[in-house]
A protein has these predicted regions:
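Alpha-helix-loop-beta-strand connector modules within alpha/beta enzyme cores
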Residues: 30-31, 45-49, 175-201, 234-255, ...
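Active-site-adjacent beta->alpha loops and helix N-cap segments on the catalytic face
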Residues: 113-123, 167-189, 207-210, 229-245, ...
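Gly-rich Lys/Arg/Thr-decorated short loops/hinges at beta-loop-alpha junctions or inter-strand turns
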Residues: 129-133, 160-165
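Catalytic domains of carbohydrate-active enzymes, especially glycoside hydrolases
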Residues: 148-164, 221
Length: 368
């Protein structure tokens, strides 16, 4: 049995007099989940039981607790990784999963992005500026309306047009007909502009449905899809990424706030580890509550390339506006896709003109 370990950091709110016992409790809970006195196998005690590697007082009753967990307990299963690092401990409402030092063995197992930032840029033949994107919405709009909207947005020169994450396989717009129609709408826009805008359908459902939808997207000539890892599950995402090597995967953060996992780890780190080529997240200053510091750490984690995995594209979203283009890109930098949805849609019949204004603002950003 190997004794290779990786370090997991938790933020624990506790009294100073209790923190050592709390840390030891997490180490046991996230490994063998039983009284150590009941274990008589020396290999289990030495190689499997979690170890407390350090405790730091970070103020205001909060402690950073570092636990060493056995790499062998993860195997090759994405779900088991989550189970081992936060399974039962997630049931304690005073603990946050803050960071995971992913060892090379697990990085190789899960693989990270198959394409990453550079491949996305290559597909668009685009370098030297940030990328642009928007979303097809609202749900409830019939297929023809979504397809027309997709065409008008594409005529504005966007790099990516994605489904809103609320679009699924619904009676008023079935997945197969919607994706075919929206892909055709984007293609018409591309013929008008000459710019290779990508359409990103949202995949939903169980694994069989996800596979069918990914296959349909592939058959339509699409090379990007979106899914919500916290909805479909990490194992399903892991399977799709492996089975669809030509597809670039955009990860949506829906339900990401329910797990008490630090956003910079969950969205910027774990989504990337599971194969997301681009990670969508709610940026500061929009309609969600992430701070600038959290957003910066998330983007840094997504763009890492020092761990033998490719860099994923950060996609700040969630109430962004055209007027904030310079501010947002000054903050995140060039290797970013700025996603603006509702603010563009406010233009209604002038959506193409407003989209052109957005794409010009991004193109002009690096010109000073």
């Amino acid at each position: 049995m190997t004794n290779s370990r990786f370090t997991v950091t938790y933020h624990v709110r506790a009294a100073a007099s209790d923190i050592e016992a709390r840390a030891q409790g997490i180490a046991v809970e996230q490994s063998v989940e039983m009284p150590l006195a009941a274990i008589n196998d020396e290999a289990v005690l030495s190689d499997i039981v979690g170890t407390v590697e350090g405790i730091d007082d970070i103020g205001d009753g909060l402690f950073a607790v570092r636990i060493g967990l056995a790499t062998a307990t993860v195997g090759q299963d994405a779900g088991q990784l989550l189970n081992m690092v936060f399974g039962n401990t997630s049931l304690h409402n005073d603990v946050i999963l803050q960071d995971i030092a992913v060892p090379e063995t697990l990085a190789q197992t899960f693989g990270g992005p198959r394409h990453g930032i550079e491949a996305l840029r290559f597909r668009l033949k685009l370098h030297g500026r940030a990328l642009t994107g928007s979303a097809l919405k609202p749900q409830g709009l019939p297929t023809e309306g979504l397809a027309t909207l997709a065409e008008h947005m594409a005529r504005g020169g966007l790099d990516f047009i994605k489904d809103d994450h609320g679009l699924a396989d619904q009676p008023y717009s079935r997945f197969a007909e919607r994706v075919a129609a929206c892909a055709a709408g984007v293609a018409r826009g591309v013929r008008s502009t000459g710019h290779p805008t990508r359409y990103i359908p949202s995949l939903t459902g169980n694994l069989d449905q996800l596979r069918e939808q990914a296959a349909l997207a592939h058959d339509l000539g699409l090379d990007c899809v979106m899914l919500a890892p916290m909805i479909c599950g990490f194992p399903a995402m892991q399977a799709l990424v492996r089975e669809c090597p030509d597809m670039a995967f955009f990860a949506h953060p829906s339900l990401g706030g329910a797990a008490r996992i630090a956003p910079e780890l969950l969205i910027g780190g774990l989504f990337r580890l599971m194969g997301a080529d681009a990670v969508i997240f709610p940026s500061f200053g929009g309609r969600f509550g992430y701070s600038p510091a959290t957003c910066r750490r998330l983007a840094v984690n997504a763009r890492r390339s020092d761990d033998r995995m490719k860099a994923a594209l950060p996609v700040p979203a969630g109430g962004m506006t055209v007027e904030r283009t310079r501010e947002i890109l000054d903050f995140y930098g060039e290797d970013t896709m700025l996603l603006i949805g509702g603010n563009l849609l406010m233009a209604r019949d002038q959506i193409t003109r407003e989209t052109e204004r957005f794409t010009r603002a991004v193109a002009n950003h690096n010109l000073g």
